């Protein structure tokens, strides 16, 4: 067992490397989550989302930090945000939302997409959807961040979203809410998903209400996004099972680039699969 910033990790491998070595570059993104609390203490908020998906678990890994599908798969949610007064700007880099996004491999199979926030954050970016009555509270949280962390770090914490995959099956979505998601295979084409909301222990009832509303609106079996994703993954699984003459899932976006990878490229997806192959290939040879 190892603990990093109050995140507890357990391995059944007696020869597992030290946790901080294993987390590698993922530590930076866990730090950005924990720094949202003035005391550095976060709490799992009461309540669990639990549902099954009839698809291979690794498809949900891909989905969890794939920004390429956002504009088409979640168009209903984007239209809802626009009607609610949220400004959705045309990307300045690439051709898809969000603007300014990058994808990064973080070592040991961990990877992340990191992009500019447009959908609001309880810590601490106000949007019209929150209502005018929430603006003073968000501004207070923002001021505390700047005072504690400095302007540059506060901007990094409050104005960017991050979807982090800690290999193999832990997802930390740090956006309009913070979601802890994990999933376990029940069969080659069936997984069980569990998710929880995370928030600062000091959070006021007003900020907590915004957080939970954002969490339920986007994520979960009744949200705007998760039903879209479940339908997509189950359709992909059916297709892969039916068309066996197509042996590969192409994941080559950005492969020839030498410059920084966009969030809509697939470097971060390939990082996961390279580590998976590294661990699994000896088994196949045996």
Regions found by a protein language model. Name each.
Residues 2-286:
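C-terminal catalytic domain of Rieske-type non-heme iron oxygenases
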